């Protein structure tokens, strides 16, 4: 039997081809589940997505993206993508928002809130302030019946049939779908703004990129 080293393990254990096959099976199943989630998302896109793009395009200020936990991390990446492709955006940590950081939102801005359950307390606590400013809010959740979805100007669903996590607990397929939806918003805005390669270069003076 051929043995493959697995790294530093107790009692110098080794991985057999059978064990490696199990690992590959899990990896492929993970990707299959996440691909299925993306396909669901693609087929679900409708006029609400177009409404969200137009809302962000018409924004006279900046786009504020807010979330907690894994949703917050995804929101940070989407904020960076928007900013680098012609749509000024900032991430607002929902947990810090009620301790003074709500001041970053102005009446000229638009807000995108992220919560897969749509019931994250720290995110829901922001709604009163957002409404008081009359700021439009796009909610990205996995539950159209959630409090966050119902309070939004536009709701975009990232619901998935199941997570890739075998425990059904860790955000995997849902976080991938959320990230992809953010990319879709950013690329539609890029195209709508006629954002060019020269514009991209202007925003990336310290980077190495290939425009060929």
Regions found by a protein language model. Give the residues of each.
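An N-terminal, well-structured beta->alpha segment
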Residues: 20-61
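Serine-centered coil/turn micro-motif
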Residues: 21, 146, 207-208
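Short, basic/glycine-rich phosphate-binding loops at helix/coil junctions
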Residues: 28-33, 78, 82, 212
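Glycine-rich phosphate-binding loops that contact phosphosugars or nucleotide phosphates
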Residues: 61-190
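Internal, active-site/partner-interface "lid" segment
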Residues: 150, 164, 191-212
């Amino acid at each position: 039997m051929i043995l493959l080293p697995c790294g530093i393990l107790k009692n110098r254990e080794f991985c057999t081809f059978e064990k490696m096959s199990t690992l590959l099976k899990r990896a492929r199943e993970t990707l299959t589940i996440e691909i299925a989630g993306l396909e669901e998302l693609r087929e679900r896109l409708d006029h609400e997505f177009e409404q969200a793009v137009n809302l962000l395009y018409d924004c006279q200020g900046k786009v504020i993206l807010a979330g907690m936990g894994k949703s917050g991390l995804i929101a940070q990446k989407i904020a960076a993508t928007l900013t680098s492709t012609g749509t000024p955006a900032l991430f607002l940590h929902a947990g810090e928002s009620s301790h003074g950081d709500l001041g970053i939102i102005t009446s000229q801005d638009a807000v995108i809130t992220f919560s897969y359950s749509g019931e994250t307390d720290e995110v829901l606590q922001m709604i009163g302030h957002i409404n008081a400013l009359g700021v439009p809010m796009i909610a990205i959740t996995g539950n159209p019946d959630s409090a966050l979805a119902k309070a939004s100007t536009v709701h975009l669903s990232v619901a998935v049939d199941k997570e890739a996590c075998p425990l059904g607990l860790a955000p995997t397929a849902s976080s991938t779908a959320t990230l992809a939806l953010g990319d879709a918003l950013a690329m539609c805005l890029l195209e709508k703004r006629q954002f060019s390669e020269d514009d991209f270069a202007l925003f990336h003076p310290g980077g190495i990129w290939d425009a060929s």
